[in-house]
Amino acid sequence: MAAATSPPRAERKRWGGGRLPGARRGSAGLAKKCPFSLELAEGGPTGGALYAPIGPPGVPGPSSPAAPAASPAAADLGPRPRVSLDPRVSIYSARRPLLARTHIQGRVYNFLERPTGWKCFVYHFAVFLIVLVCLIFSVLSTIEQYVALATGTLFWMEIVLVVFFGTEYAVRLWSAGCRSKYVGIWGRLRFARKPISIIDLIVVVASMVVLCVGSKGQVFATSAIRGIRFLQILRMLHVDRQGGTWRLLGSVVFIHRQELITTLYIGFLGLIFSSYFVYLAEKDAVNESGQVEFGSYADALWWGVVTVTTIGYGDKVPQTWVGKTIASCFSVFAISFFALPAGILGSGFALKVQQKQRQKHFNRQIPAAASLIQTAWRCYAAENPDSSTWKIYVRKPSRSQALLSPSPKPKKSVMVKKKKFKLDKDNGLSPGEKMLAVPQITCDLASEEQRPDHFSVDGCDNSVKKSPTLLEVSTAQFTRTNSFAEDLDLEGETLLTPITHVSQLREHHRATIKVIRRMQYFVAKKKFQQARKPYDVRDVIEQYSQGHLNLMVRIKELQRRLDQSIGRPALFISSSEKVKDRGSNTIGARLNRVEDKVTQLDQRLELITDMLQQLLSLHRGGTPGSRAPGGGGAQVAQPCSGGSINPELFLPSNALPTYEQLTVPGRGPEEGS
């Protein structure tokens, strides 16, 4: 079966079963350098165009007339595999390409110099344990009762470590070539001049010298090379090759340099003065043994350092009460300043950790913000009729489609790569059986109207032949290898024509793209809001307090605007304040003025009515106080001063009344109608 589907290895190698050289330089280079050419085989059952390889001279190909007679059984196995037009992919081999040398260098360099992941952690932690065990045995070799045990074991451990560190140094030097600044001999020398590389080289050379000079397996036999033992302790620096510890310490010291300098300066002044005054008080004092403990200023400085650093050896003690008083006073003052740098550094480290956490939280917001900006811009650009807005949704025609389609009409194919891979994976088919199990169908847009049912026999490719071991396909019955839902999904993907130009986009395409972009915008907005959520309780409290402060400011501003527009409520202001507030332009003051005017108009209307009634009664000659002839029981008001009209009633008054005059007194029952 396998022999029938693929040519032999020797024949494959001879007739170009591997890469297709020269394909990147056009079809001319492909025709010159490739042992076989690609011929367009037309007249298939579906009218589609397929490329089939033409074999070497004397070997019948798929288009040769002798092909059906050469192997009848092979003709029933199904269609031949399509020839890939990608020059980087082999026709008969699907093996992964070999990793490039620079790629391997980069992976090794990242593994050694930029450790990330659990594998790197395990490796570097194992190296740390080995170095720590070697250091412990080095310490035990200096103890007399463990010399015999530790020295022999240490000798072999030193040999293993020298070989290991030497090999690792060479590998590091080789893998550094993946970076542009370390390429070549001068680049390697630049890498070797790094401080940590120099330390590694010194450790390897020192260990080699110790092993070479040592005799009879004794690592530290001679006293001449015992000084090199310190260089072997430098292996502990190998643990932190990236120098993150020193960078962190340096950044903390640099940030708090002013506070550290201040405390150290004042503490140093306290040390000098306290030592000097104690020396003056104790320079002639003699202890119980008859010796002068503070015979020089250097002895006093030593006592001061031991005292202010809270060590207290007790080798020098003040003898006089004057010296003890001076020592106690200055000790309290100086010890407090010498203890401050530890607290400053501790708080600096805590702030640094918090700053890194904030930076991590902020870095998580950057991709979300970028995605939100991008989606917002795309939503805005969707309203622009420019063609560049829609080019990202247009599929570029591949080189294989350009070669397979001689006519300008586009073709549709069932071979959807992702769906095919999923179906093959679900069915558990081997690579040699995939081409037999999945039918290859090509659809022509010109005959799309006359196309029968998609699930009928005529709608499938007749090139699917039966296989005695996989499935039986006859012309009268169609055998399904997939579920109905998968066939529907496959049908939905096959009926979609790829858009190759912006002009092919229709209004429903553009509307769908706008809807998708708007949905992407809402999703990106939600993710950005989730990324901006605070991660600490203190941040939550700070955010709430800041929000409460902003809310109070807004409420006060709103209250001020309401007071300016409406005015203060009448229940909370006195009469004098109302008088003062009447001249303002608030709504309340305007309403008060309107009410005053309405009251004044009401009074004038009543006055005019009384005057008209008096004039009417005088004109008719009636007695004062008599009823009007019209009846109605209304009594006419009597004229003032014996029939004369008060002229003050006709005087116009434009002056506004006071607030106390605004209230009209209620009429009694006798003043009614």
From Swiss-Prot:
- Binding, a 1,2-diacyl-sn-glycero-3-phospho-(1D-myo-inositol-4,5-bisphosphate): Q242
Protein's GO biological process: adrenergic receptor signaling pathway; auditory receptor cell development; cellular response to cAMP; cellular response to epinephrine stimulus; cellular response to xenobiotic stimulus; cochlea development; corticosterone secretion; detection of mechanical stimulus involved in sensory perception of sound
Q: How is its activity regulated?
A: PIP2 molecule is essential to activate KCNQ channels by inducing the coupling of the voltage-sensing domain (VSD) and the pore-forming domain (PD). Upon channel activation, PIP2 disrupts the VSD-calmodulin/CALM interactions, causing the release of CALM from the VSD which triggers the opening of the gate. Calcium potentiates KCNQ1 channel current through calcium-bound CALM. Calcium-bound CALM competes with PIP2 to stabilize the channel open state.
Q: What SUPFAM superfamilies does the entry give? A: Voltage-gated potassium channels (SSF81324)
Disulfide linkage? none
Q: Please give the residue ranges for the topological domain Extracellular.
A: 141-151, 217-224, 282-297, 319-320
Protein's cellular compartments: Cell membrane; Cytoplasmic vesicle membrane; Early endosome; Membrane raft
> What membrane topology does this protein have?
Multi-pass membrane protein
Q: Where is this region: Disordered?
A: 1-28, 61-80, 619-673
Comp. bias intervals (Gly residues): 622-634
Q: What is its main location?
A: membrane
Subunit field text: Tetramer. Heterotetramer with KCNE1; targets to the membrane raft. Interacts (via C-terminus) with CALM; forms a heterooctameric structure (with 4:4 KCNQ1:CALM stoichiometry) in a calcium-independent manner. Interacts with AKAP9; targets protein kinase A (PKA) catalytic and regulatory subunits and protein phosphatase 1 (PP1) to the KCNQ1-KCNE1 complex, allowing PKA-mediated phosphorylation and increase of delayed rectifier potassium channel activity.
Protein known as: Potassium voltage-gated channel subfamily KQT member 1
Q: Which gene encodes it?
A: KCNQ1
